[in-house]
Swiss-Prot record:
This is Non-structural protein NS1. Belongs to the orbivirus non-structural protein NS1 family. It comes from Bluetongue virus 17 (isolate USA) (BTV 17). It holds the Pfam family Orbi_NS1.
Length: 552
């Protein structure tokens, strides 16, 4: 391959097309209808490697350039390219796949440094909690912001606690006759008194050890208190409570409209659209008057998801009046996965998802109808059937497929998914890392990308592999800010033509090896901290990364 490319000075997109076609040629099915595939009676599409060797040995540049043109022409049908790649890569060859993976990893580690990603990792603050909680907008703790009142007075507490700067005010929901906006002038004095009292009685957060002021209050049903003593439950619920407070603090600012659009898919006219959507009187099939009251009056169970507001089901009710019954049923039966509920309980094969940020970056609509696939763990992401311009996404612990009509849209959609769900720590033997590489491979092979987009894709490959690897001082970079992450990925330097060609070869080989490994059922293999052996063929990447960090 390299001899052919260098001999005839083939580079850039033509070199990338030649590499790709060489890999899929053995399984290529050609109809020979155009007859332009036949050289001396042999179909070069099905015997591409033999034709390359013959053209190189015979020094026939005209035939060589024709081979390259055929490869480039084949790349125009990206759907066929993806299907042929998938078919070819899932049939293991007699080769040292793990060794090739490690060599690709060594090259990617070098790219991690040269692409600027390592510089950016140095600049990030240290991740305080390495057990990263994955949050998304399909669930919300927003109902617990609102103040329960009875006869115009805040309902008396039965217990108080705190999470960092948030006071937890536990009460009996049956004692309340309404819930109101916490900013209303008439209750500000009582609201501030609660904050001062919690701060006085509990000066240290029982979850984090934080000692400081209390600035906000969340009003929680007393039934929740025992579940918050469970570590995993508290870890997730507290993060969603913190996210709800951050959204509440944007009320009255320009960002409020974006949050409301993201959560509900519509923005009512007038002031304070968030409070309008939460407290508006709804025609619910029960005596509950608002979604806040409906949520707060219903207890969950030991699953933290069962205590939060199911925003996908809420949007179904907003779009179809008769589906408000689903909202009540979902909470009464304490479901934890909204997509499972829609697919299995209601026989709904598709639902709407909203991504305001991707819409702003690509100029496309924020609303997408997506096909509901399998729950995480039920089936491998590699077995999800992808047709035409579909790409995999994820809400909570459930996969879906969505249509991406351009390479830019596919790149950004995948980047957002990877930021939320994939953690590359340099030891590559978990399914999450394989999922990330598979999704990036789908973007690389299925969509026609510009050089700038392939440069961004390389940075995503580096992130999937090394983004959360410990730095020289042992700390882990904090990539939690999605806006900063996308700026680093999408606005980084563009590769030169030579760098682009080498990067494509590395990414392509890694994708090929991953699909081969997974279909050969060799999902787990030695981590990259293995000592060097076989003349250095297997590279100690952990040691090499440590050496790189010492340079910063």
């Amino acid at each position: 391959m390299e001899r052919f490319l260098r001999k005839y000075n083939i580079s850039g997109d033509y070199a990338n097309a030649t590499r790709t076609f060489l890999a899929i040629s053995p399984q290529w099915t050609c109809s020979h209808l155009k007859r332009n595939c036949l050289f001396n009676g042999m179909c070069v599409k099905q015997h591409f490697e033999r034709a390359m060797i013959a053209a190189t040995d015979a020094e026939e540049p005209a035939k060589a350039y024709k081979l390259v043109e055929l490869a480039k022409e084949a790349m125009y049908d990206r759907e066929t390219v993806w299907l042929q790649c998938f078919k070819s890569f899932s049939q293991p060859y007699e080769e040292d796949v793990e060794g090739k993976m490690k060599r690709c990893g060594a090259q990617l580690l070098e790219d991690y440094r040269k692409s600027g990603m390592m510089n950016e990792a140095v600049k990030q603050s240290a991740l305080v909690n390495s057990e990263r909680i994955r949050l998304d907008d399909s669930l919300s703790a927003m109902p617990y912001i609102y103040v329960p009142i009875n006869d115009g007075q805040i309902v008396n507490p039965t217990f108080i606690s705190r999470y960092r700067q948030i006071a937890y005010y536990f009460y009996n929901p049956d004692a309340a006759d309404d819930w109101i906006d916490p900013n209303l002038f008439g209750i500000r004095g009582q609201h501030n008194q609660i904050k001062r009292e919690v701060e006085r009685q509990i000066n240290t957060c029982p979850y984090t050890g934080y000692r400081g002021r209390v600035f906000q209050v969340m009003f929680l049903p007393i039934q929740l208190i025992n579940f918050l003593r469970m570590d995993d439950f508290a870890k997730h619920f507290n993060r969603y409570a913190s996210m709800a407070i951050q959204q509440y603090l944007r009320v009255g600012y320009a960002e409020e409209i974006r949050y409301v659009q993201q959560l509900f898919g519509r923005v009512p006219t007038g002031e304070f659209p968030l409070h309008q959507m939460m407290l508006m009187r709804r025609d619910l099939p029960t005596r509950d008057r608002s979604i806040v009251e409906a949520r707060v009056r219903r207890s969950g169970d030991e699953n933290w998801q069962s205590w939060l507001l199911p925003m996908i089901i809420i949007r179904e009710g907003l779009d179809h009046q008769d589906r408000w019954e689903w909202f009540i049923d979902y909470m009464d039966r304490k479901h934890t996965c909204q997509l499972c509920y829609l697919k299995h309980s209601k026989q709904i094969p598709a639902c709407s998802v909203i991504d305001v940020r991707a819409s702003e970056l690509t100029g496309c609509s924020p609303f997408k109808m997506v096909k509901i696939e399998e729950h995480v763990g039920n089936d491998s992401v590699f077995k999800t059937k992808l047709v035409r311009d579909e790409q995999i996404g994820r809400i909570g612990d459930h996969y879906y497929t969505t249509n991406c009509y351009t390479g830019a849209e596919a790149l950004i959609t995948t980047a957002i998914h990877i930021h939320r769900w994939i953690r590359g720590s340099g030891i590559w033997n978990d399914e999450g890392w394989q999922e990330g590489i598979f999704m990036l491979g789908r973007v690389l092979l299925r969509w026609e990308l510009t050089k700038a987009q392939r440069s961004a894709l390389l940075r995503l490959f580096c992130f999937v592999c090394y983004g959360y690897a410990p730095r020289a001082d042992g700390t882990i970079p904090d990539w939690n800010n999605l806006g900063n992450f996308l700026d680093i990925i999408l606005k980084g330097p563009e590769l030169s033509e030579d760098e682009d060609e080498r990067a494509y070869a590395t990414m392509f080989e890694m994708v090929r090896c991953i699909i081969t490994l997974c279909y050969a059922e060799k999902v787990h293999f030695a981590g990259f901290a293995a000592p060097a052996c076989e003349g250095g063929e297997v590279i100690n990447l952990a040691a090499r990364m440590s050496q790189m960090w010492m340079e910063y």
